[in-house]
Design a protein with these regions (language model features):
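Histidine- and/or cysteine-centered catalytic micro-motif in compact active-site loops
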Residues: 77-79, 101-102
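Glycine-rich SAM-binding Motif I of class I
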Residues: 82
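Generic short alpha-helical segment signal, independent of protein family or function
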Residues: 61, 65, 79, 89-93
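Short glycine-rich phosphate-binding loop at a beta-alpha junction
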Residues: 69-78
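Active-site-facing substrate-recognition patch
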Residues: 1-69
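Conserved hydrophobic/aromatic pocket- or pore-lining residues that grip, position, or stack substrates
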Residues: 34, 74, 96
């Protein structure tokens, strides 16, 4: 579901600018889920670009408040969403937690 078409298009442009989107139809990527796909987006690359990470942080924060109101906490899945999740939580003045794929042993 796209909450804001302009934000989605600009984010896609930014991801393409920093080569975060990889295509390889001949040798599909294996995602953490085990799925194979010809496309991979390394969202963690955005953390190395201050202007891009700030844009994403602000747009995520605006969309969260618009769609859900002010939450009690921000959660990010390990490991790919920890960085952006922390940025959003800090920006919104909220606690942050991360979600593991399985309980810690």
């Amino acid at each position: 579901m796209i909450f804001n078409k302009d934000t989605a298009e600009k984010t896609a442009e930014l991801l393409l600018q920093i080569n975060a989107i990889k295509l390889n139809p001949k040798n599909p990527f294996t995602w953490t889920s085990g799925w194979k796909a010809p496309i991979y987006c390394d969202n963690r690359m955005t953390l190395s670009f201050p202007a891009i990470r700030n844009y994403i942080r602000e747009e995520f924060s605006k969309n969260i408040e618009k769609q859900f109101g002010k939450p009690d906490v921000i959660a990010g899945v390990a490991t790919g969403a920890i960085g952006i999740g922390m940025l959003v939580a800090e920006y919104m003045g909220l606690p942050f937690v991360y979600v593991r794929p399985e309980p810690k042993k």
